[in-house]
Amino acid sequence: MIKFLSALILLLVTTAAQAERIRDLTSVQGVRQNSLIGYGLVVGLDGTGDQTTQTPFTTQTLNNMLSQLGITVPTGTNMQLKNVAAVMVTASLPPFGRQGQTIDVVVSSMGNAKSLRGGTLLMTPLKGVDSQVYALAQGNILVGGAGASAGGSSVQVNQLNGGRITNGAVIERELPSQFGVGNTLNLQLNDEDFSMAQQIADTINRVRGYGSATVLDARTIQVRVPSGNSSQVRFLADIQNMQVNVTPQDAKVVINSRTGSVVMNREVTLDSCAVAQGNLSVTVNRQANVSQPDTPFGGGQTVVTPQTQIDLRQSGGSLQSVRSSASLNNVVRSLNALGATPMDLMSILQSMQSAGCLRAKLEII
């Protein structure tokens, strides 16, 4: 009896773990962020700003700012500034953002500044694609990196030419919203999936009545909603908390060709195959031989002749058997048995897919 109850509890937990809320799988069409961008100046740097002789736009921007403050710089003045840097400022305007609300901004150096650590961003207007100002940014920059240099040597950890200002911008203009207008809303799946779209529509129809949700395509589910903002908010809140059973994912292997990382999901399977992988290494060693005359006054000359030695080695290449694997653990165990490096594993997986032994989509990023 105890074993039966334990098995039943385990089954229920496993079943519940496969269910997810609709809000985690979809988003409401039209409810999205909007990108903002601006150009500004960072001051207060400890000698790590732009070299103004090489970045004339920094000096021009500073002159324009000073003229707006009533300060006139004589024409032709060569200002040797080290504590100022020209930067680009980016931010995201959240959906339903209201005037007075604060948002985070990212500050990135545009010139040849060495570091933005300790700098202060001066008031910078942030514009949208329509060239309208939607927010104003200003504040002290937090840089996550660190660095030091002395005597021709330098040490740097992480990036110093970019930083972030938490709540560094204030929204000054609101975006018009179409939410609450009309009797339909579209839910968009995060990943296109016909079966998942149909399952979400069926779940909504069972709770809200037949015809409440209609699948338009593999990513979009159209939902009939009551009119009015408050009614639609309550309706969406109920729908987004509904749970649906997640269908199995498509088997996929993602390869990052720049970093050499290989990631695969649990749906990946292997068929039996044989793999031979040989490693070829080429070593080039070059030395300079100096030949000098034995007699200092014999009229001979010192001759430098390069000597190059090339060593080519090939290892491995034996044929190894890869067993059919139906679970992710077995797939990992089979691939590890090959003893291949991540870079070698990329070509092996591509060859496996071409041979029909890798039951997965191969995506190279």
Swiss-Prot record:
It comes from the Bacteria. GO terms for cellular component: bacterial-type flagellum basal body, distal rod, P ring; outer membrane-bounded periplasmic space. It is found in: Periplasm; Bacterial flagellum basal body. Keywords: Bacterial flagellum, Periplasm, Signal. The keyword Lipid metabolism does not apply. Residues 1-19 form the signal peptide. GO terms for molecular function: structural molecule activity. InterPro entries: Flag_FlgI. GO terms for biological process: bacterial-type flagellum-dependent cell motility. Assembles around the rod to form the L-ring and probably protects the motor/basal body from shearing forces during rotation. The basal body constitutes a major portion of the flagellar organelle and consists of four rings (L,P,S, and M) mounted on a central rod. Belongs to the FlgI family. This is Flagellar P-ring protein. It comes from Shigella dysenteriae serotype 1 (strain Sd197).
